């Protein structure tokens, strides 16, 4: 799951244009165009429920066949091939019952150990209509990483794939500062068939360096395991099963979907004519913050953070504008290997390794007193 540089994803011919845009917006020393992103997502949600474990995180390996197909190849043959390629895995009624018991016993307010709410559930691969898909019977992945296998390779616990011959899974993340080992919680659902571990929760819990749980919400701090260092709030009780992360987003790199991607990350949209791709339409109204630390104090989630500006992309809605389809994809990533690294990013002395639209926000301490409402409490002592 090693990432590749943006110029490999978009094509070498885009390098000059990225550099020109960076210069115009004073985004010097941004990680463009060599920013590394671990994978790209195309056509649909950034995750699927574990019983929809195909298709695909499409790993980027700069090839035109097998993994990392180009867009045209993916939309024609690639979209159907993972269905028959992924291993066949089944689930059991006893495991489903374990999920229900875990949910009923673990739903209380305040800081809850997610380990108390975790469960072991096998994966059943099915298509969007719910029917059993075809696939290999040797529990091996042939051509593509399906969702469950991609998560497993990143260290996410998918119990039925623990024997899959891939990268060993770490399985458990430790919340920094508190020494609390946690596992992913299950998603609340009225349907027994839907009582499966929340994939997005697992992805977050594995790919983050810090995590806290409060009043049914999981708040995390990203790391270089995902293409961004933004935080997101994941509500376990979302009945639709959609996460707030990249909801309703297509990432066809090199198109205006890059602009949509940035809009989704920042939680706002400059074109009010369509809100389907905006996080606000999904109930996430908090502004984006980069987080320096997380903790829970007296049932309040407290973290050190600074408010992110409008990360440099062209906000024009003019379809004829030359920058509309560029959207500065490099601004969506913050490589930890770039100059200054994580400390500069947190301190915000140079914005995203460079000024964010020439604005620099001071570090602040913020408190989530009620889910969805931010209260600035000033600097900590």
From Swiss-Prot:
Record lineage: Bacteria, Bacillati, Mycoplasmatota, Mycoplasmoidales, Mycoplasmoidaceae
Residue segments, region Disordered: 1-109
Pfam families for this protein: MgpC (PF05220)
Family classification: Belongs to the MgpC family.
TM region positions: none
Compositional bias ranges of the Basic and acidic residues kind: 40-51, 61-73
Taxonomy, superkingdom: Bacteria
Biased composition (Polar residues): 13-31, 89-109
InterPro entries, per the entry: MgpC
Signal peptide as annotated in the record: none
Designated name of the protein: Putative MgpC-like protein MPN_503
Organism: Mycoplasma pneumoniae (strain ATCC 29342 / M129 / Subtype 1)
């Amino acid at each position: 799951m090693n990432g590749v540089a943006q110029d490999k994803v978009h094509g070498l011919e885009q390098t000059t244009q990225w550099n020109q845009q960076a210069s115009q917006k004073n985004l010097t020393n941004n990680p463009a165009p060599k920013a590394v992103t671990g994978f790209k997502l195309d056509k649909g949600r950034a995750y699927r429920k574990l019983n929809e474990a195909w298709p695909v995180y499409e790993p980027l390996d700069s090839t035109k066949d097998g993994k990392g197909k180009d867009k045209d190849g993916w939309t024609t043959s690639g979209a159907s091939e993972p269905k028959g390629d992924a291993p066949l895995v089944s689930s059991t009624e006893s495991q489903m019952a374990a999920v229900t018991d875990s949910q009923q016993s673990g739903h209380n307010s305040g800081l809850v150990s997610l380990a108390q709410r975790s469960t072991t559930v096998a994966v059943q691969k099915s298509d969007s209509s719910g029917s059993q898909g075809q696939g290999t019977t040797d529990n091996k992945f042939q051509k593509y990483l399906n969702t469950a296998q991609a998560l497993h390779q990143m260290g996410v616990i998918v119990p039925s794939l623990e024997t899959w011959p891939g990268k060993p899974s770490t399985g458990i993340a430790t919340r920094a500062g508190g020494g609390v080992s946690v596992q992913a919680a299950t998603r609340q659902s009225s349907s027994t068939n839907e009582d499966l571990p929340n994939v997005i929760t697992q992805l977050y819990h594995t790919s983050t360096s810090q995590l806290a749980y409060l009043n049914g919400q999981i708040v995390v701090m990203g790391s270089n395991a995902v293409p961004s260092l933004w935080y997101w709030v994941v509500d376990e009780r979302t009945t639709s099963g959609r996460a707030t992360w990249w909801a309703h987003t297509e990432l066809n790199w090199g198109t205006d979907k890059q602009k949509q991607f940035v809009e989704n990350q920042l939680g706002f949209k400059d074109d009010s004519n369509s809100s389907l791709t905006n996080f606000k339409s999904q109930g996430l109204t908090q502004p984006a913050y980069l987080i320096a630390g997380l903790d829970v104090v007296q049932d309040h989630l407290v973290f050190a953070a600074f408010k992110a500006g409008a990360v440099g992309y062209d906000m024009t809605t003019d379809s004829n504008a030359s920058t509309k389809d560029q959207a500065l994809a490099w601004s969506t990533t913050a490589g930890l290997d770039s100059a200054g690294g994580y400390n500069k990013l947190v301190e915000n002395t140079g914005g995203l390794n460079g000024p964010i639209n020439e604005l620099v926000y001071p570090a602040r301490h913020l408190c989530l007193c009620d889910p969805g409402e931010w209260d600035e409490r000033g600097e900590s002592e």
